[in-house]
Regions:
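Phosphate/pyrophosphate-binding loops at sites that engage ATP/ADP/AMP, CoA/4′-phosphopantetheine
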Residues: 83-96, 195-204, 252-267
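Small-residue (GG/TT-enriched) beta-loop-alpha framework at ligand/catalytic clefts
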Residues: 98, 103-192, 272-273, 288-297
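Gly/Thr-rich phosphate-binding beta-strand-loop-beta motif of the actin/hexokinase/Hsp70
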Residues: 1-31, 136-168, 185, 215-221, ...
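Forkhead-associated
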Residues: 352-435
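Helical "lid/coupling" subdomains associated with nucleotide-phosphate turnover
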Residues: 220-346, 363, 371-379
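Conserved phosphate-binding loops in N-terminal lobes of ATP-dependent enzymes
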Residues: 11-99, 226
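Phosphate/oxyanion-binding active-site loops and adjacent basic polyanion-contact surfaces
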Residues: 71-83, 177-182, 240-252, 295
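Phosphate-binding glycine-rich/basic clefts of nucleotide- and phosphate-handling proteins
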Residues: 160-241, 272-277
Length: 435
């Protein structure tokens, strides 16, 4: 019996169970007295604003729902319904380990556990998601995690003592959520449409929804290039990355104020969604983006210590640092992990010329830390650390390394460029530790 892993952040709830991976942002849409959640609900947010609720995780309580939304009495009913949908679509796991935000209050955690008791699965673990993520990194100084939710962002501060990552404090950043930043981005882009085409995509709900739908791909493109085109209803506007950098100003400034003056030994990590925000690298230099499956990786490696069967669940806010037992390339780049034992003896590994160290993958203007266990590159490929260095594994689109076809068992290092299929150029780099 496999345990499902549930990452609760309302900007993108995720569940992993066996080969299943579900993603479902915290949107609830009322359709004929029934609820739809996640991406289908988000796709109707501008079309049916009176039938949408996006606050039910953030404002989890048993107070009467205002404004009313169908048969739900309170936000707890909507949370219950989304959990049931995830359980149903995720293969109906019998047990779940949950990673939740440190911004959840004690009474909200108690209510969440009460809701889970009414679900067709058992919660066997409950952990602060920032601490779980922090255990993948660690720091000789302070470790900060920037979490972007729908209606606010959160800074969690942690320290590492005696090989354990411990939560110190949680600071909500009001008015800095994904929805507020999106609203500002759409405002800037709409102004560009009006200036360039005299067409205002926000005048009608349908074209406004189309603009919101186009936003993620446009931001990804701006992470690679300085300009991109956005097309809505046959009208096209040219958008410059620099024009959008002010949209995240409140978030970036609030995060800096919450962390205070950073010392060389301090470290800052952030949820992947933060990487879409223009200006991130310039306003928060040194910030490291988490991989998309970092929560899964952390929970899997910490699973034995998190599972609490046949007892009242405690909220875990301290975990062993995984880098004390797993060599991390961005911490100790010159030491390769020990080879795993093989059932069948392999032929001796031929000598491989030493490659320049690599700790990060440069994607446009954002440097993503490389994970020893593997970092997903897309289109069926990932890069992982072996006994001889960084190598690709997978099967998918054709791969070019330094503009030449990938060779079998090719070892990669700092300075090497990758291009998968028709995707953007990626480059392996070494980020020197701050001193």
């Amino acid at each position: 019996m496999s345990i499902a892993l549930l990452d609760i952040n309302d900007s993108n709830l995720q569940m992993w169970h066996g080969s299943s991976h579900l993603q479902s942002p915290g949107y609830a849409l009322l359709v004929d007295k029934q609820y739809r959640f996640g991406n289908p609900a988000r796709a109707a947010a501008r079309l049916q604003p009176r039938d949408i609720n996006t606050r039910f995780w953030w404002q989890l309580s048993t107070e009467a729902l205002q404004p009313a939304l169908g048969p739900a009495r309170h936000t707890g009913d909507l949370v219950h319904a989304q959990l049931q949908e995830l359980h149903r679509e995720g293969g109906q796991p019998q047990e779940v380990v949950m990673a939740v935000s440190g911004s959840m209050q004690r009474d909200q955690l108690a209510l969440l556990l009460g809701i889970v008791q009414q679900c067709p699965f058992a919660a066997v673990g409950l952990v602060n998601r920032s601490v779980a993520l922090g255990s993948l990194y660690g720091a000789s100084g302070r470790l900060f995690h920037l979490e972007v939710q729908l209606h606010q962002s959160v800074i969690c501060e942690m320290v590492q003592n005696n090989g354990e990552v411990q939560l110190q404090r949680t600071l909500p950043l009001p008015g800095t959520g994904l929805l507020q930043v999106q609203e500002r981005l759409v405002e800037i882009i709409s102004t560009a449409f009006i200036r360039q085409t005299r067409f205002d995509p926000r005048r009608k709900a349908l074209t406004e929804q189309h603009l919101y739908d186009a936003l993620p791909d446009a931001l990804r493109a701006l992470g690679r290039e300085s300009e991109t085109n956005i097309e809505v209803n046959g009208y096209r506007a040219r958008i410059n990355r620099a024009d959008l950098q002010d949209a995240g100003t409140r978030l970036f400034e609030s995060a800096r104020d919450a962390m205070g003056s950073l010392k060389p030994e301090d470290r800052v990590i952030a949820d992947p969604i933060a990487g879409l925000l223009p200006g991130l690298a310039e306003r928060l230099p040194g910030l490291e983006l988490l991989a998309a499956d970092s929560v899964r990786s952390a929970l899997e490696q910490q699973l034995d210590g998190l599972v609490q069967r046949d007892q009242a669940l405690s909220f875990v806010t301290a975990l062993p640092s995984l880098i004390t037992t797993t060599a991390a390339p961005d911490i100790v780049p010159d030491i390769a992990p020990e080879p795993r034992p093989e059932v069948v003896a392999a032929p001796p590994t031929p000598a491989v010329a030493a490659k320049p160290a690599a700790t990060h993958l440069l994607q446009g203007a954002v440097a993503v830390p490389l994970a020893t266990a593997g970092t997903t590159l897309g289109q069926g490929w990932e890069i992982h650390r072996t006994t001889v260095g960084w190598q690709l594994r997978g099967a998918g689109a054709a791969v070019l390394v330094n503009d030449s076809p990938l060779q079998p068992d090719q070892v990669l290092g700092g300075g090497d460029s990758l291009r998968i299929g028709d995707g953007p150029e990626l480059r392996l780099i070494e980020v020197a530790p701050q001193r």
